[in-house]
Amino acid sequence: LAAIEFSSVSYRMPNGVMALDDINLRIEEGELVAIVGGNGAGKTTLLKHLNGLLKPSNGEVRIFGKNTRDSSVAQLSRKVGLVFQNSDHQLFSESVKTEIAFGLRNFGFSEAEIESRIEDVVNYYGLADMLNRAPMTLSGGEKKRLCIATVMAWEPSILALDEPTVGQDYMNKIKLRDVVKSLLSKGRTVLIVSHDLEFLWPFKPRTVVMGMGKILADAPAERIYLDSELLDRAGLRQPQLAMLAKALGRDRPFSDADEATDWIIGEHASYEFRGLK
């Protein structure tokens, strides 16, 4: 049973624009999938179909086999946690503690369980000393962690992150990678919508490329990242490690700068050795 399944899904916006056009996509439980593409590609519109914020004009979206047309947003949100690009649009409570507690109360958790879950997530996401602070006073990175903590407090099976690296510095991106790794180790299904291919590359995820509401490609990251023509068509910048690998004639991108350095030094040494023979 797939965690997520889009079957011939199209969505026409109120202004008549076709935001999704014949989307067919199956994502298994425990899988990490990157959804990439330029502005207006349909990435966020696709995410909003996961918890019923939008319903397809045509076709079906199923979450663990259940048609989203047959469930409310509240019912779907219990299984699908969405973290949107702009944290300010997701935060509204007077304190970090009440922000996290809000969703848990809506889902009917006992007060004792709410207290326990709040303690767990604030410790894990580095928010323990901010419980009484107003969310709007937090930094960009702290707000993003709070949004993720708020969603993960009720332990949805699926987490979808919309442009999670926007406005984040290098260290916060590293922390975010650790969060994603932890979720995957627990068997969660994770979708990351992003144009930041450098951030995504260490995961080497299955990558779905979107453009003009359509799926342009669905393949392993190694193949997508070397296809400069596809990336150009999707309005994406080819990662530097992929550009270097392609220039050197490799059939896959380097995993990191250390691998690139070792490979180049090794090739150079090999040329010198052959020259001396």
Model-predicted regions and their roles:
Residues 51:
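Helix-to-loop junction immediately C-terminal to a conserved catalytic motif
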Residues 159-162:
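Catalytic Walker B motif of ABC-type/P-loop ATPase nucleotide-binding domains
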Residues 112-130:
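Conserved ABC ATPase "signature" region
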Residues 194-195:
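H-loop/switch region of ABC-family ATPase nucleotide-binding domains
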Residues 36-38:
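The feature captures the beta-strand-to-loop junction immediately N-terminal to the Walker
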Residues 59-67, 76:
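Conserved ABC transporter NBD signature motif
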